[in-house]
Amino acid sequence: QTQNAHLEFVEVLNVKEQVVAGMMYYITLVATDDGYKKIYKTKIWVKEWENFKEVQEFKQIVYATK
């Protein structure tokens, strides 16, 4: 079974940026999974000049209600 296969984006709660070899974005967001709202944290590394984007981390941090 594929994890996170049924996620649907709801909203962004928070974004932080860090300058690295490019930019690292730390995003907290809400998504629904089979109708249940859950909160996730993701870390995305971006190097614009190389057209490079990579998800470094994506994990659920809070269970929410329907």
UniProtKB/Swiss-Prot annotation:
Keyword flag Hydrolase: no
InterPro entries xrefs: Cystatin, Cystatin_dom, Cystatin_sf, Prot_inh_cystat_CS
Tissue-specific expression: In tubers of untreated plants. After ABA treatment or mechanical wounding is mostly accumulated in leaves, to a lesser extent in stems, but not in roots.
Keyword line: Protease inhibitor, Stress response, Thiol protease inhibitor
PROSITE patterns: CYSTATIN
Gene3D superfamilies found in the cross-reference section: 3.10.450.10
Motif (Secondary area of contact): 18-22
Induction entry: By abscisic acid (ABA), jasmonic acid (JA) and wounding.
GO MF annotations, alphabetized: cysteine-type endopeptidase inhibitor activity
Pfam families: Cystatin
Family: Belongs to the cystatin family. Phytocystatin subfamily.
The protein's name: Cysteine proteinase inhibitor
Gene (UniProt): CYS-PIN
